[in-house]
Amino acid sequence: MKFLVDVHAHTIASTHAYSTVHDYLAVAKEKGIKLFAITDHGPDMADAPHFWHFVNMRVLPRIVDGIGVLRGIEANIKNENGDIDFFGSYLNELDIVLAGFHEPVFQPSTQTTHTQALVNCIESGNVDIISHPGNPAYPIDIKRVAEVAATHNVALEINNSSFLTSRKGSLKNCTAIARAVKEAGGYLVLGSDSHVAFSLGGFDKAIELIQEVDFPIERILNHSPKALLEFLTSRGHKGMDEYAEIV
């Protein structure tokens, strides 16, 4: 099983990451990756890029040397209301919006608080994908979140980095999330959460998990460029036709 689309990658604009857009393009070419998203951390993170970084992503070509580049963000969920740190008409200019919990912005609290924050964030309509929802530092009502996400056409991420260097102890939660999303009829997406270009498209542990739960591949959004682009179009994102040559 091979996935040639990655929705979650950070550049040196997030200064705890170590690669440029050019670095990612080189690795994508080497690995045969067809489409990937640049999703630097939202501006409320201490070392995140300025708000204008995201506004100016319009200068990025959507296709470079046959590789699609999505203009995105991994926004920070700020509070129980589900607010994120990027807003207004600027959201509509991005191709893909991830959002998740990060300790410097939203300190871990109770399961009830975390669950309500995710539900409100999903229901806001501002977010396409919830990033690393299996983080054990932020326990949630998995069944409820999966059902709300399915109802509102929002995907939950199985984050490969959570099984390697970050968010230790995520496997049990992520397995439960995959089972709950399968039951609810919703979507998953696999993300490398790459902070260095070498790990772009690295999904080995996430693939093991989805195989274990027998998750239907047609409901894993990055199983093909077409599937992800059709999902983003259904979410109201414009410009997806510009990627026609890679579909």
UniProtKB/Swiss-Prot annotation:
GO term, biological process aspect, one: bacterial-type flagellum-dependent swarming motility
Obligatory cofactor(s): Zn(2+)
Listed Pfam families: PHP (PF02811)
Residues engaged in binding Zn(2+) 2: H16, H41, H195
Record-level GO cellular component terms: cytosol
Enzyme superclass (EC): hydrolase
KW Nucleotide-binding (keyword) present: no
Superkingdom of the organism of origin: Bacteria
GO terms of molecular function: phosphatase activity; zinc ion binding
Binding-site positions, Zn(2+) 1: H8, H10, E74, D193
Classification via SUPFAM superfamilies: PHP domain-like
Entry's EC annotation: 3.1.3.-
Co-factor binding details: Binds 3 Zn(2+) ions per subunit.
The keyword Hydrolase is assigned to this record: yes
Signal peptide interval: none
InterPro entries: Phosphatase_YcdX_put, PHP_dom, PHP_phosphatase, Pol/His_phosphatase_N, Pol/histidinol_Pase-like
Family under the similarity heading: Belongs to the PHP family.
Designated name of the protein: Probable phosphatase Shew_1420
Biological source species: Shewanella loihica (strain ATCC BAA-1088 / PV-4)
